[in-house]
């Protein structure tokens, strides 16, 4: 132990400094000393002394948190007796000290929960010593209110702790503990909690009694934790609860069939203080979401009836809903009425007509208060969206009344948004239109709601649009209109254009009629007429939000009415012809292109408009028939012949803008490339003509690089814009003839400029990232476009350039030294990731025979591979999996290397081989299925290589194995634990986890077993003996069947047989382990 911490008094002082001081250096010194204390051998004994004798709450907190760390560590865990003693000590300590600071009590309860969870399967004399949780807290529950609060907190924290996976322990162990806790304790805890709540609700709560309030709050938290439990291990994503079903076990049926459980929470809502009711509503949300299969039809109807009655009672007494938290939870509860029940079931509820009226009134009122709780409104719109979507399918004879109430909801949404515009402008409030994500989400919901009783929606939109458009036109004609009034009308029109786009996008082909298509035509005509008006004013003024709404409208219109699948006889086109003279799709496409060119001309410096305009162009260029119609338009030919900054300002060099703003240029040139390819064929003259602006830009850059004194910033911007343009063209050119023209254009003339830029600006990712991404595109053999003639050396020359760029960048980026964590990815790891992608694409493209490089003494392949190794070793293992793009590019490259270049892997230094094997081992348990599958493939290639080499070395005849093979075998024999660990990991995943890629996992497993027969036998015995005695024979038989008919080779036939056996094995093991209470603790080899 270091000198600074000699006594309890010193520890007390350090705790005070850590938690109270405002001086940073003092706090850091205290933190450092306390970290040393935590890691010291006497930490455990001194923690007990601190709890016994410490005079400050902070020292008690330190002791509790240190003990929690000690019991949580997976390496060198505390002995069982010691953990039992700590658990008992915590229970006694809290039982004798009810007046501790709340944060100390919470820390000790957390300690109890952690010990109990991690020791759940620990047994002593055939007794699971950590499972008697209700017995542990009974003495607290039978005492005063203060003690009862502590007892309930124990159960609440434990339920929460067991429900949460812990990154430091295997997911398999977490799920086994959670499942066992669910089956053996959770229902008893839930029942106890409900009973205590019933007792509490039966008494009149003293509003002044804080301890009673604490008890009620803890009971509600406990109940919510029980209902929120991840019963079947599927709730990994908590970011969305729209379609959440609570998978209540069948053994809990009695509690939900008893209507008093549901009634308890509705009664509590009406009887307890408002600050507790959000939790009550949260519990009701979970109860309303119980899985449908828990009930038969009659039981579900009865349950739903009680639920709807409770909702009705809240709506009839809405006073508490003025609280934002109550309001939010109640909106969630309403949404669950439709996400978990069918409209046909709802309409059969006795009070349905009254309830749907109350819900409609509540929704209308909520929407009218547009400034209030937009996140809660999401759930209301979700309810109405699902109700409206169900109308075509409902078969019940009872009226659903949605034809009455849905138009009211639509009208309320539309009119409230329009009315908000004036208030926002007048009071300088935050504009909802600034939150594009929220607006889009609401519009997606409205698109379905608005299509219900569409004639009413359309009539409303036409009336409001005509009104605003007429006022807007009059204001413009007056010439002296106040800017405020103009802004109001532009804001209203912005909302209307967004909403019109949404309801058109909500058209469903099988449910739409000619009349509805004609109504769409009415709306489209109005938007296009407005566009003509606003475009005519762009030289003087424009409104960015209105333009963005137009682009949103065009996108929806394109999806529904432009393309190969649309019936051209649509009544919409007839209406467009009558009003605007647009007779067919080609004429409508000319409107699209005209708008795109207008936007690029006037809004070239506005990134949001430019990027969305170019995305629209890109989407239009994908359709097979539409792209052929587009090419015939004079406006498109103009773009193909005049793609310069003179006509399109966003192609210019703007020193004020960010270089990342140039990304949209790639989208532009991808679209132009597709349009050019329609008629390009092998016309080199047409290609050269198209490339003239880029040729001029490259020649200009070449002159800059040749002169000693050039403007570096200007050169960078020119180059970045150019490579982004080229990447777009390269992406679009997926035919051999066009791609070969591009290749001949760029190589050898301009490739040296890219190499020179990497040398000069390797430290600037704004410059290197686009260049490396262009290289990745050029070497990508998409659609077999890189098929060089047999007499052409271009494949090898292209790889040489690739190798040169990777080597240049790799060697220089490694000179950057230590980088701050927050800049590491941007400055280094992103570039490394792209280099891995470049190398993978080049190695797997099948256009280079890599055997010739060594044959002719060409170092290009070796240089690239050695650079890969250097870059890899500069990246810590943890970073490989922490950054998804890096992990995906690394593991996909490694897959190619182990498949085609195993001799290179085998020739590496031992520490490099161990690094690669460790990365595969860690990747096997990655959450990303793509990474996990790649690791299985890598492991399979390595194991197959090992097996073949061992088989050859066992035979006397034939040539001796290469030197690198012998070295590799020697390294593997020196470190058998690495392959053995991977064998246990793969088997562990297949037996105990929800294995999503079973086929991939099966491929390396046979090789691993054949290479480690003795270890596999031990592992198998360990797994069998860890089962309860009555299950051991069945598990033994599973393993026997797994190896039934399997020979000692890795021939395809034998592998396929093993894969089939493994599928049966997994099914049999799962059946065998059902209802088993065995635990991982007796199976250390598996963890």
From Swiss-Prot:
InterPro entries, A to Z: ARM-like (IPR011989), ARM-type_fold (IPR016024), Importin-beta_N (IPR001494), XPO4/7-like (IPR044189)
Give residue ranges for domain Importin N-terminal: 30-96
Subcellular location(s) per record? Cytoplasm; Nucleus
Matching entries from SMART domains are given as: IBN_N
Q: MF terms per GO, please?
A: nuclear export signal receptor activity; small GTPase binding
The Gene Ontology biological process annotation of the record reads: protein export from nucleus
Q: Please verify whether the record's keywords include Transport.
A: yes
| GO CC, alphabetical | cytoplasm; nuclear pore
Renumbered to this chain, the signal peptide range is none
Recorded superkingdom: Eukaryota
Q: Does the keyword Metal-binding apply?
A: no
Q: Keyword annotations for this protein?
A: Cytoplasm, Nucleus, Protein transport, Transport
* Subcellular location, principal: cytoplasm
- Sum up the protein's function in the record's words: Mediates the nuclear export of proteins (cargos) with broad substrate specificity.
By sequence similarity, the record places it as follows: Belongs to the exportin family.
**Protein name, please?**
Exportin-7-B
This protein's species is Xenopus laevis (African clawed frog)
């Amino acid at each position: 132990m270091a000198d600074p911490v000699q006594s309890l008094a010193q520890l007390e002082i350090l705790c005070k400094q850590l938690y109270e001081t405002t001086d940073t250096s003092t706090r850091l010194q205290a933190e450092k000393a306390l970290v040393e204390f935590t890691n010291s051998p006497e930490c455990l004994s001194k923690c007990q002394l601190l709890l016994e004798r410490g005079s400050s709450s902070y020292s008690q907190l330190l002791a509790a948190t240190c003990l929690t760390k000690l019991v949580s560590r997976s390496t060198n865990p505390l002995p069982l007796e010691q953990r039992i003693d700590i658990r008992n000590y915590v229970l006694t300590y809290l039982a004798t000290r009810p007046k501790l600071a709340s944060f100390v009590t919470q820390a000790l309860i957390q300690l109890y929960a952690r010990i109990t969870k991690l020791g759940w399967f620990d047994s002593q004399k055939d007794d699971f010593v950590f499972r008697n949780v209700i017995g542990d807290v009974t003495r607290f529950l039978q005492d005063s209110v203060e003690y009862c609060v502590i007892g309930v907190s124990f159960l609440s924290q434990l339920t929460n702790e067991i429900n949460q996976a812990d990154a430091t322990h295997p997911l398999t162990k977490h799920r086994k503990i959670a499942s066992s806790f669910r089956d053996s304790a959770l229902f008893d805890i839930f029942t106890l909690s409900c009973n205590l709540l019933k007792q509490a609700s039966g008494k009149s709560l003293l509003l002044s009694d804080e301890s009673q309030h604490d008890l009620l709050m803890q009971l509600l938290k406990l109940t919510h934790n029980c209902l929120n439990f991840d019963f079947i291990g599927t709730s990994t994503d908590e970011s969305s609860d729209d379609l959440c079903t609570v998978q209540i076990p069948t053994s809990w049926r009695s509690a939900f069939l008893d209507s008093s459980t549901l009634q308890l929470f509705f009664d509590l809502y009406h009887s307890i203080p408002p600050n507790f009711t959000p939790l009550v509503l949260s519990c009701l949300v979970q109860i309303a979401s119980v899985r449908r299969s828990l009930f038969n039809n009659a039981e579900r109807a009865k349950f739903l009836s009680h639920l709807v009655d409770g909702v009705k009672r809240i709506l009839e007494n809405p006073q508490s809903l003025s609280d934002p938290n109550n309001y939010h939870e109640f909106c969630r509860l309403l949404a669950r009425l439709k996400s978990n029940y069918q409209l046909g079931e709802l309409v059969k509820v006795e009070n349905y007509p009254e309830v749907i009226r109350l819900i409609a009134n509540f929704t209308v009122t909520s929407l009218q208060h547009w400034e209030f709780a937009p996140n809660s409104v999401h759930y209301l719109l979700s309810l109405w969206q699902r109700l409206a979507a169900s109308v075509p399918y409902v078969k019940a004879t009872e009226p659903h009344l949605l034809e009455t109430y849905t138009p009211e909801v639509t009208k309320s949404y539309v009119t409230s948004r329009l009315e908000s515009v004036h208030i926002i402008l007048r009071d300088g409030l935050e504009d909802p239109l600034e939150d594009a994500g929220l607006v889009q989400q609401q519009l997606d919901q409205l698109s379905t709601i608005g299509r219900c009783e569409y004639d009413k929606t359309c009539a409303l939109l036409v009336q409001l649009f005509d009104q605003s458009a007429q006022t807007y036109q009059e204001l413009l004609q007056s010439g002296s209109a106040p800017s405020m009034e103009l802004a109001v009308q532009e804001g209203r029109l912005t909302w209307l254009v967004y909403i019109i786009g949404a309801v058109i996008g909500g058209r469903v082909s099988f449910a739409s009629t000619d009349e509805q298509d004609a109504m769409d035509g009415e709306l489209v005509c109005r938007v296009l007429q407005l566009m003509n008006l606003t475009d005519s004013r762009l030289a003087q003024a424009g409104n960015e939000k209105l333009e963005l709404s137009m682009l949103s409208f065009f996108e929806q219109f394109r999806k529904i009415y432009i393309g190969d699948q649309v019936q051209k006889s649509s009544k919409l086109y007839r209406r467009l012809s009558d009003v605007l003279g647009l007779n067919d799709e080609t004429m409508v496409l000319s409107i699209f292109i005209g708008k795109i060119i207008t936007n690029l001309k006037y809004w070239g410096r506005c990134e949001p408009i430019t990027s969305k305009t170019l995305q629209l162009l890109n989407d239009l260029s994908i359709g097979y028939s539409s792209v052929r119609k587009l090419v015939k338009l004079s406006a498109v030919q103009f773009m193909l012949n005049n793609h310069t900054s003179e006509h399109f300002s966003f192609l210019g060099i703007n020193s004020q803008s960010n270089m990342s703003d140039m990304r949209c240029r790639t989208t532009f040139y991808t679209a132009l490339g597709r349009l050019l390819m329609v008629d390009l064929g092998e016309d080199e003259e047409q290609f050269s003509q198209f490339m003239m602006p880029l040729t001029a830009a490259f020649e200009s850059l070449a002159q800059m690089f040749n002169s000693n004194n050039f403007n570096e910033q200007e050169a960078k911007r020119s180059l970045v814009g150019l490579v982004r343009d080229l990447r777009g063209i390269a992406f679009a050119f997926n035919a051999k003839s066009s791609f070969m023209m591009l290749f001949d254009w760029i190589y050898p003339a301009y490739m040296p400029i890219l190499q020179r830029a990497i040398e000069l600006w390797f430290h600037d990712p704004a410059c290197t990232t686009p260049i490396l991404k262009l290289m990745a595109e050029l070497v990508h053999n998409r659609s077999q476009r890189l098929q060089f003639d047999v007499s052409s050396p271009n494949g090898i020359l292209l790889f040489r350039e690739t190798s040169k760029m990777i080597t240049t960048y790799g060697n220089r980026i490694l000179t950057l030294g230590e980088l701050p964590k927050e800049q590491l990815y941007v400055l280094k790891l992103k570039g490394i990731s792209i280099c891995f992608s470049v190398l993978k694409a080049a190695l797997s493209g099948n256009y280079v025979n890599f055997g010739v490089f060594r044959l002719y003494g060409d170092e290009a392949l070796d240089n690239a591979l050695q650079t890969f190794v250097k870059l890899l070793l500069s990246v810590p293992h943890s970073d490989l999996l922490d950054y998804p793009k890096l992990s995906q590019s690394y593991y996909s490259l490694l897959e190619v290397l182990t498949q085609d270049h195993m001799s290179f892997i085998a020739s590496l230094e031992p520490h490099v081989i161990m690094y690669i094997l460790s990365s595969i081992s860690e990747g096997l348990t990655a959450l990303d299925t793509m990474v996990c599958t790649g690791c299985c493939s890598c492991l399979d290639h390595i194991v197959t290589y090992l097996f073949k080499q061992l088989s050859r070395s066992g035979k006397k005849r034939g040539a001796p194995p290469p030197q690198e093979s012998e070295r590799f075998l020697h390294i593997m024999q020196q470190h058998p634990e690495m392959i053995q660990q991977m064998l246990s990991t793969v088997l562990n995943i297949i037996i105990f986890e929800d294995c999503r890629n079973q086929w991939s996992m099966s491929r390396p497993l046979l090789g691993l077993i054949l290479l480690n027969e003795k270890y596999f036998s031990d592992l198998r015995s360990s797994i069998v003996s860890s089962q309860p005695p009555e299950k051991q024979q069945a598990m033994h038989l599973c393993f026997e069947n797994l190896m039934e008919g399997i020979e000692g080779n890795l021939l395809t036939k034998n592998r396929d047989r093993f894969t089939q056996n493994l599928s049966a094995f997994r099914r049999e093991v799962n059946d065998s382990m059902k209802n088993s209470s065995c635990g991982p603790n007796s199976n250390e080899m598996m963890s």
